[in-house]
From Swiss-Prot:
Localisation: Secreted
Cellular component terms (Gene Ontology): extracellular region
Protein name: Snaclec convulxin subunit beta homolog
Annotated C-type lectin domain residues: 11-13
Family: Belongs to the snaclec family.
Subunit composition and interactions: Tetramer of heterodimers of alpha and beta subunits (alphabeta)(4); disulfide-linked.
Tissue expression from the record: Expressed by the venom gland.
Record keywords, A-Z: Disulfide bond, Hemostasis impairing toxin, Platelet aggregation activating toxin, Secreted, Toxin
Function: Activates platelets by binding to the platelet collagen receptor glycoprotein VI (GP6).
């Protein structure tokens, strides 16, 4: 519900 600074995966679950 926020997601991704530089290179995360599929974090916004």
């Amino acid at each position: 519900g926020f997601c991704c600074p530089s290179g995360w995966s599929s974090y916004d679950r």
